[in-house]
From Swiss-Prot:
Top-level taxonomy: Eukaryota, Metazoa, Chordata, Craniata, Vertebrata
Job description of the protein: E3 ubiquitin-protein ligase that plays an important role in neuronal differentiation, including neurogenesis and gliogenesis, during brain development. During embryonic development initiates neuronal differentiation by inducing cell cycle arrest at the G0/G1 phase through up-regulation of cell-cycle regulatory proteins. Plays a role not only in the fetal period during the development of the nervous system, but also in the adult brain, where it is involved in the maintenance of neural functions and protection of the nervous tissue cells from oxidative stress-induced damage.
Biological source species: Bos taurus
This protein's UniProt keywords: Cell projection, Cytoplasm, Cytoplasmic vesicle, Endosome, GTP-binding, Membrane, Metal-binding, Neurogenesis, Nucleotide-binding, Nucleus, Synapse, Transferase, Transmembrane, Transmembrane helix, Ubl conjugation, Ubl conjugation pathway, Zinc, Zinc-finger
Domain of life: Eukaryota
Listed GO MF terms: GTP binding; GTPase activity; ubiquitin protein ligase activity; zinc ion binding
GO annotation, cellular component aspect: cell body; cytoplasm; endosome; membrane; neuron projection; nuclear body; nucleoplasm; nucleus
Record field: transmembrane: 544-564, 577-597
EC number(s) recorded for this UniProt protein: 2.3.2.27
Residue ranges covered by zinc fingers (RING-type): 57-98
Name of this protein: RING finger protein 112
PROSITE patterns referenced in this protein's UniProt entry, alphabetically: G_GB1_RHD3, ZF_RING_2
UniProt record, GO biological process: embryonic brain development; endoplasmic reticulum organization; neuron differentiation; protein autoubiquitination; protein homooligomerization; regulation of cell cycle; response to hydroperoxide
Pathway(s): Protein modification; protein ubiquitination
Amino acid sequence: MPRSALSVISFCHRLGKQERKRSFMGNSSNSWSHTPFPKLELGLGSRPTAPREPPACSICLERPREPISLDCGHDFCPRCFSTHRVPGCGPPCCPECRKTCKRRKGLRGLGERMRLLPQRPLPAAALQETCAVRAEPLLLVRINASGGLILRMGAINRCLKHPLARDTPVCLLAVLGGPHSGKTFLLNHLLQGLPGLASGEGSWPRSAGSGQGFRWGANGLSRGIWMWSHPFLLGKEGRKVAVFLVDTGDVMSPELSRETRTRLCALTSMLSSYQILTASQELKDTDLEHLETFVHVAEVMGRHYGMVPIQHLDLLVRDSSHPSKAWQGHVGDVIQKSSGKYPKVQGLLQGRRARCYLLPAPGRRWASRGHGSSGDDDAGRLRAYVADVLSAAPQHAKSRCPGYWSEGRPAARGDRRLLTGQQLAQEVKNLSGWMGRTGPSCASPDEMAAQLHDLRTVEAAKKEFEEYVRQQDAATKRIFSALRVLPDTMRNLLSAQKDTLLARHGATLLCTGREQTLEALEAELQAEAKAFMDSYTVRFCGHLAAVGGAVGAGLMGLAGGVVGAGMAAAALAAEAGMVAAGAAVGATGAAVVGGGVGAGLAATVGCMEKEEDERVQEGDREPLLQEE
């Protein structure tokens, strides 16, 4: 086909795709040049770009899935390339420009090469800019109308499995307090100071409002535990910690039942590593009572999950009547008030894990910033406290400490293992699974401790029985080892081990429903023993059949050889061919009989003689084995 004709055809295809009702005429000068591939830029831009579409065919303008690309820059679909290609041409010839050029791989080969490129970690600033999408408070634990708790694992995974927190140690700043204690107002100021500190600027935002974060007032965030969906990376390079803000909601509300409040304290202790308790004017008896419950529950959870119960606690008191009062004196007053009545709080305040701050009341002075020197001074105090909290947050990442309670003393810093966001999400899931199985008797920290103790006891009994079954399975893998232990004997061994475990671990249970717990444990152990016995019985029968077949075939094969040799010696007068045939048939027949008897021995060991007689009678059909 002439070159001009091909150019006209390609030109018609192009214009016909855009305007099918327009008539035209062209020549070789009207051929379009294909746009070259854009340069591949690896990096993260400020705006997300749409995915690039595959190149269009130069003839039909379709976008094939696997285009044929040539070095000249033109692309074709397989159908057009095979139709308009010049026949008999060795190297590929472009149907568009008639140049002889090599063929390039399509987009599939390009994608494979891009996957083989070395992956470079993105800068923290760029990654944080990308991840800062739709940051909002998320409800993690909801309190329904009946007072029950609903754990939203989807929201927890969205926060803790964030790209910045999935494989990074996490610090959870949780603010506790009763109604109208300035809790939400403090969260907003913490939220304002975090972006500047995370970006390295360290500057306070110029806007002095409460921010667009946690809402303030009666219609704000309540009835559950909330968390800011976006973490902030703080700390030195190489030791970054993902910091989250947590609003505990109504965890200290007197309207909740004791059971709901105890469970909320357990979830709060799991979802916090730096607690701030806010109180108006002074710590009341109700605040100390709720704090005593929280510390007790945190110790119970720490003992069960191997975590440091209270890593750091701030007592933030709004004392508008005595703004210059020393915080040491206030802590002394609190310790004296809690003496004997709140031992957990007293022990916490006497240690190094708690400190006290006195700030002006939020309703009067913080809102008057810019209208006098006193307002500026009070706002400076708030900023100083917020900066102090955020600078100390990376040092209080959520920590796991296995030897904390076993040795009876705080472990060293090097003994702790910092939990990442993904690990903490798994621990929260385990806690929710236990709470879903427990009964209504969890109205106090002591009852929760008893239930967790029984849970550890049951798990220990299960693991011990599983280990015993594994040992028996490993000891009976070989044939002769398995034949020494009959299935009935193995069943008796498992039953005795189960009774021993139930008697030993059942005596250590603490909850009132001890019988129900033992019945459930016995059912699980019996199910595991039955599953093992089913597989062991099949294995034992297989080993017995193999040994019986081998022994029977060997013994009867030897007997058949002896009988054949004797008959050959008795038939010396016969012809040589008849003697050889007799010996061969005798040996073969006896071997067959032996194999049959061996199989019978494996199936029914007690009836070996009867099965042997039947097999021999079947073999008497052979002429040379007939009896006189």
